[in-house]
C-alpha cells in the first residue's frame, strides 16, 4: 500500500521542525506501507497526479477539511484497514490550500476528514495526520504504541 501525505503549496527549500517531525512519523510507517510527503502547487496538480496513480484499484483521496468528519484513532485505523483489506493500492491524505478546498475537490474526495474543531497551521496538521497514520498502522498490527482509552 502506498500512502503519501500531500499538501498544497510550496515550502520552498526551507525545512523546519514540523517538516522533520512529519518525516519521522512517515518513516516509522515503513514496515506497514510506503509513505512520503508530497507537495503540489495547486489542487489541479494534486488531481492530475492522482489520475496517474491508478493501478489495479482507483486511488483514494482523503482531504483534511474542517467541515469533514472527525473520527477516533481506532475508527481511522479501521477505515485504513478496510481499504488495505480491499486491496486499495493508493490512499492519499491531503492537507489543502490556505483558503480551503474547492467545492470540486471536496466532491471528488473519498473522505473529508476533520482533525477536530480547532484550526491548525498546515505544518502542524501534517504532523498530526502523519502521527495518526502511524498510530493507525500500529493499531492494526497490535503494536503497543497505541493503548487507547476505553
Explain the meaning of each model-derived region.
Residues 1, 33, 58-59, 108-110:
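Short glycine-/polar-rich loops that comprise or flank the Walker A/P-loop
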Residues 1-29:
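N-terminal beta1-alpha1 ligand-phosphate binding loop
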Residues 5, 62, 96:
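A residue-level signal for conserved active-site and pocket-lining positions in enzyme catalytic cores
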Residues 11, 66-69, 97-101:
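Short glycine-rich anion-binding loops that position phosphate/pyrophosphate groups of nucleotides
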Residues 15-17, 72-74, 103-105, 124:
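Short glycine-/acidic-enriched loop or helix-start segments at secondary-structure transitions
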Residues 18-22, 76-79, 107-110, 127-128:
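Short, glycine/charged-enriched secondary-structure capping and boundary segments
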Residues 28-92:
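S-adenosyl-L-methionine/SAH cofactor-binding core of RNA-modifying enzymes
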Residues 103-149:
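Structured adenosyl-cofactor binding patch, chiefly the S-adenosyl-L-methionine
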Amino acid at each position: 500500500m502506498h500512502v503519501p501525505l500531500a499538501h498544497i503549496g510550496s515550502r520552498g527549500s526551507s525545512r523546519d521542525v514540523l517538516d522533520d517531525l512529519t518525516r519521522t512519523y512517515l518513516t516509522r510507517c515503513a514496515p506497514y506501507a510506503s509513505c512520503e510527503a508530497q507537495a503540489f502547487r495547486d489542487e489541479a496538480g494534486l488531481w492530475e497526479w492522482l489520475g496517474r496513480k491508478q493501478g489495479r484499484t482507483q486511488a483514494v483521496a482523503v482531504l483534511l477539511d474542517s467541515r469533514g468528519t472527525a473520527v477516533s484513532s481506532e475508527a481511522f485505523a479501521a477505515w485504513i484497514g478496510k481499504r488495505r483489506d480491499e486491496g486499495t493500492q493508493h490512499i492519499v491524505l491531503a492537507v489543502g490550500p490556505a483558503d480551503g478546498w474547492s467545492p470540486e475537490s471536496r466532491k471528488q474526495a473519498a473522505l473529508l476528514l476533520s482533525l477536530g474543531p480547532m484550526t491548525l497551521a498546515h505544518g502542524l496538521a501534517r504532523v498530526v495526520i502523519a502521527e495518526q497514520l502511524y498510530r493507525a498502522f500500529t493499531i492494526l498490527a497490535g503494536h503497543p504504541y497505541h493503548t487507547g482509552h476505553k
